[in-house]
Every structure is written in C-alpha cells, then in structure tokens.
C-alpha cells in the first residue's frame, strides 16, 4: 500500500499540480500528526478542559482548541509557500511567507465539545491561491469553487486523512509508525439514503421547510417518502461527513429563528466549503438550501451559513422545499 509520501508526487505529476501545493498539504499533515498525539493522550497530557478564553464568535475555547490552533499556525508559517492563514479561532488573518503562493484556512479542532468525553473530533482545512497584491482579508474571500485543495483529519478509533485536489478523493490511515497509508480511493456517496443527521433538540426553532422535511422522514414507510429513515448525531462535523462519505446520508445544520441575523451556525470558509468540495468530488451535493455551497461569494472570514450536504437526492429535495 502507498504511503502519502510515495503517493503524493505521482498524484501531483499526473494532474499537473505544483510540487509546492503538495508541500503545503504535507505541512498540514505534519501539524495534524502532532495534534493527533495531543488528542490521544488527553488527560494524561493535561490538555482537557476549558482554556478560559473565547474566540471571535463568542464561543468558549477548550485547551485543545488553543493548542491545535497554535500547532497549525506554527507549522504552516514555517513553509515559505504559505502566504497567509485564517483560522476559526483567530480574529483576523495571520501573515506568513512574504513570497508565498498559497492561503490556508482551517478549523483546528472541529467538534471540540466532544473532547472531554472521548468522541471523534477532527481538523478541517482548505487551500487557496493567493491573489496578486498585498495580503488582505479580501485575499481570502474566494468562492469554494476556487479551492485548490480541501481535506480533513479525523481523530477517531483510527486517525484518517481525507483530501482532494479536485481530482478525486483519497483516504489515508495513520499506522503505528506515524505514516499515513492509502486505504481508500475515490469513495462515492450513494444518491439515495435512509440516514439523516440533525440536532433534533432545535426542532422548534427551524424554518417551516426543514420542519416539514423532518416530519416526512419520521413518518417512515407509511409517509410521503415511502421508506424508514434512521437518525444519527455525533455533534462533530468531521465524524458526520466521514460517515456520509463511507455509506451515504444527509447532514443538516439549518438556519433557525432564534437569531434572524445569523443564517446558520457553521462557518462557510473553515467548514462548509472544504467539506462541500470533498463531497462534490465523491458525487454528493451541498447547499445552503438556496444555492450550491461552492458558489456562495464570501463576505467575511467568519461568515456563517445554513448547511445541507450529502446524498444528492435528499439535498435536491430540501432545495425544492425551500423554493416553494
């Protein structure tokens, strides 16, 4: 089986991609391998619990949020091909190499509310080309279609790296020697599914199309959908999307009525865009219920969006309900 270091040069050459772009991916992987070691030790390393700080979104940070964020920043700044960074945990962008060609955006530890109870978490990342001119916030505000690469690392029973350069999706598993080994090529998400993932406790706050959709799923084979559905909810986007990649399903984090000014909870740049690129490469769909996720023009680094992604039949049906 191919290791990442053997696979990557050949993949880059086959698809006429720059070696430096592969080097940025390897820097991300190096950082994630270090984060994995911290996650694995947990309480033994004294990294669990709250950090006593908050991020720009007003969320309390876990110790591992801060540790993972610092590891990502330090590792990526050491790569001269990286011009700038943007993190869910930072107020604004971070300057890196003066002559760098690439921008890296990331959620250093997705699902960190699960850390203290030993449930799967992960790191999500996106790589963009730096536009000409001085680095500014606007440099990062590119649509998801402009991503050069996207991926995530799942820290679960196995530690797995999943990424795409826009030429298929590849999955690698970390072995005992701390090497990522290719374990699956080009997974395809089934068009139809019988699984959905949503936080049902928020049902009373959802907009009518989402309430209708969930009611139809819960009605099962005697309802309009004509089949029984199972619900899943891990509260870790990386874990949810990984399951969908492996066996299908639809993941939803809709807008709700509590704060009309907030179109959703998840971040377009750090979570929705990279996951959408991966899923589209695997034959799935992703939208905010009104347009394809990858076509949304970002307005700010920390922009939030409603998220519907997974098996294409379900995402298309949700889009139709919202269009009524």
UniProtKB/Swiss-Prot annotation:
Protein location: Cytoplasm
Entry GO terms, CC: cytoplasm; cytosol
Catalytic activity of the protein: beta-D-fructose 1,6-bisphosphate + H2O = beta-D-fructose 6-phosphate + phosphate
Single biological process term from Gene Ontology: fructose metabolic process
Pathway: Carbohydrate biosynthesis; gluconeogenesis
List of residues binding Mg(2+) 1: 88, 107, 109
Cofactor annotation comment: Binds 2 magnesium ions per subunit.
EC numbers for this chain: 3.1.3.11
Gene3D superfamilies, per database record: 3.40.190.80, Fructose-1,6-Bisphosphatase, subunit A, domain 1
Transcription among keywords: no
Binding positions (Mg(2+) 2): 107, 110, 271
Binding site for substrate: 110-113, 199, 265
Keywords tagged on the record: Carbohydrate metabolism, Cytoplasm, Hydrolase, Magnesium, Metal-binding
Cofactor: Mg(2+)
UniProt-listed CDD domains: FBPase
GO terms assigned for molecular function: fructose 1,6-bisphosphate 1-phosphatase activity; magnesium ion binding
HAMAP family in alphabetical order: FBPase_class1
Subunit text: Homotetramer.
Family: Belongs to the FBPase class 1 family.
Protein name as catalogued: Fructose-1,6-bisphosphatase class 1
Source organism of the structure: Neisseria meningitidis serogroup B (strain ATCC BAA-335 / MC58)
Organismal lineage: Bacteria, Pseudomonadati, Pseudomonadota, Betaproteobacteria, Neisseriales
């Amino acid at each position: 089986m191919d290791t990442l270091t053997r696979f990557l040069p050949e993949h880059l050459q086959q698809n006429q991609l720059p070696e430096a772009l592969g080097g940025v991916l390897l820097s991300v992987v190096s950082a994630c391998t270090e984060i994995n070691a911290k996650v694995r030790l947990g309480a033994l390393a004294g990294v669990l619990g709250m950090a006593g700080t908050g991020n720009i979104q007003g969320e309390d940070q876990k110790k591992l949020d801060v540790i993972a964020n610092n590891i990502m920043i330090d590792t990526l700044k050491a790569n001269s091909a990286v011009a700038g960074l943007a993190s869910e945990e930072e107020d604004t962008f971070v300057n890196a190499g003066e002559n760098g060609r690439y921008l890296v955006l990331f959620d250093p530890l997705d699902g960190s509310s699960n850390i203290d109870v030993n449930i799967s978490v992960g790191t999500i990342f996106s790589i963009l080309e730096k536009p000409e001119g001085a680095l500014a916030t606007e440099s990062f505000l590119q649509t998801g279609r402009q991503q050069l690469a996207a991926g995530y690392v799942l820290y679960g029973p196995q530690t797995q790296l999943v990424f795409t350069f826009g030429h298929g999706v590849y999955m690698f598993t970390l072995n005992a020697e701390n090497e990522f080994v290719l374990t699956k090529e080009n997974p395809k998400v089934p068009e139809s599914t019988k699984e959905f993932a949503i936080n049902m406790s928020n049902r009373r706050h959802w907009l009518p199309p989402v309430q209708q959709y969930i009611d139809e799923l819960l009605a099962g084979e005697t309802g309009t959908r004509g089949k029984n559905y199972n619900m899943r909810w891990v509260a870790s986007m990386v874990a949810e999307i990984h399951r969908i990649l492996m066996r299908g399903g639809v993941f939803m984090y809709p807008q709700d009525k509590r704060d009309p000014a907030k179109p959703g909870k998840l971040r377009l740049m750090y979570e929705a865009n990279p996951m959408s690129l991966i899923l589209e490469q695997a034959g799935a769909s992703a939208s905010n219920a009104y347009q394809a996720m990858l076509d949304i023009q970002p307005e700010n680094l920390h922009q939030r969006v409603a998220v519907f992604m997974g098996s294409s039949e379900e995402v298309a049906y949700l889009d139709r309900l919202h269009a009524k």
